[in-house]
Every structure is written in C-alpha cells, then in structure tokens.
Amino acid sequence: MKKLNFIIKCGLALLLLSFYSCESWLNVTPSDRLSEEMLFNDREGFVKALNGVYIELNTNELYGRNLTAGALDVMGQYYSVASSSHAFYNYGGLVYTGNDEKALFDNMWQKCYAVIACCNTIIEKCDERQDVLPGVYYGLYKGEALALRAMLHLDMLRLFGPVYDETSKTAECIPYVTNTDAQISPLLSAEVVLESVIGDLKTALNLLKESDPVLTDGVRNEGNSIGDNALNYRQFRLNYYAVKA
C-alpha cells in the first residue's frame, strides 16, 4: 500500500510539474540523444562508432565464438563433441530445446540486432553530417556500415530462416531493420530479406569503389605517421574486396 501511495504521489507531482512548465519540459534533451549528437559532431566520432561495431562483432555472442568456432561450427559438424557434459554436446546432436541452447540463440539474436541498430545510426548520421565527413570519409564509413548491416542480417537469415527454395522463400522469418525507430519491425520473407541484403551490398560497393584506399594503395599495413589510422589497416575492415566477394 505504501508503494502504491508513493507511485500515486509521484504521478500527481509529475502532472502538476507538467502544467507548471510544460514548454521547458518538452525542450529537455534526453541524455542518450545528447550523447549521440556529441559523438557524431566530428569525424573522429564516426571512427569511434564504427570501431565500436567491430568490437561488438568480436564478442562471444557473435563472431568472437558463437558464429565462428563455437556453437555454429559444432552444429555444422566441424567438431565431434563426444562427452555429454560438454557445453556444446546438444548442438552436435542438433538438439536445441534446452534452456541453455535457447538462451544462447536468444543472446545471439539480441546482440546481432543491437549491433544492426548501431549500424543504422551510423548510416543515418552519415547522411545528416556530411559536413564533417570530407573527401572519402562519407563513402567509406557509410559503405562499411551498410555492408556490416547486410552481413549481420544474412547470418540471422542463415540461422533463423528456412532452407531456401521456391516453396520456402515466401515464408516470414526475420525482420530486416533499416531505421533507428524504437518500433518492432515486421517479419519478412526470406526472399525479401535476401533482396535487402543484396541491395545494401550493391550500395555499399558503389560507395566503397569511390572511397576505399585499398583499391589504390592496398591495405596500408602500417601506422600513419601522424597517428590517424582511419584509412590504414584495411585488411581488418569490411573493405571493398570483402564486400565484392
């Protein structure tokens, strides 16, 4: 009862405050939005955001383990897991109904779409802040973000979509998220998802063709003398050739 009274009092206080200073309250900038605007206020912010995406790709939920030499490879029968006490034993037997298995797939899904959301923010901000992305940087950053978005959606389709054929391709399976809205995106058919993947890759390829230094200077496998390595070590990025492959 005390908790209920507290909630009611807080609600009344907020209501009175809104009547007292509605205009000021509406003009308050949320902290996450403020941080976002500050991050993308210069080119270095875009570098940090894109680096953050690559760092998240390396977590255990994604390519640091589960989507490479972890559960996925065991499911693909690359490894033989004979001991029933092994954490990946059920994956080798194609049994995914246990709580641990469900949790792994759930974490994989959530992490993947969280990273996709970061890619979408970068793509959106590239268009909004072209003024701080001179020369090749606009095409380079937007191209990489588009390619990363396509790659992640393709892996989600491989995991959670149907075996692709003329019959199954129309079945709804996963969303293809291209915006930063906090709304639930609808499930799309495997056919539409693949069309979206190809569309993103084509756009990324066109952007990187005009901006990626890997085409003219190679991977630039050394540090820049002035300490700015944004255009160096291209072998560690989703570069033009990686997208084209």
List each language-model region with its residue ranges.
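Conserved, well-structured interaction surfaces
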Residues: H86-F160, L187-V192, N206-L208
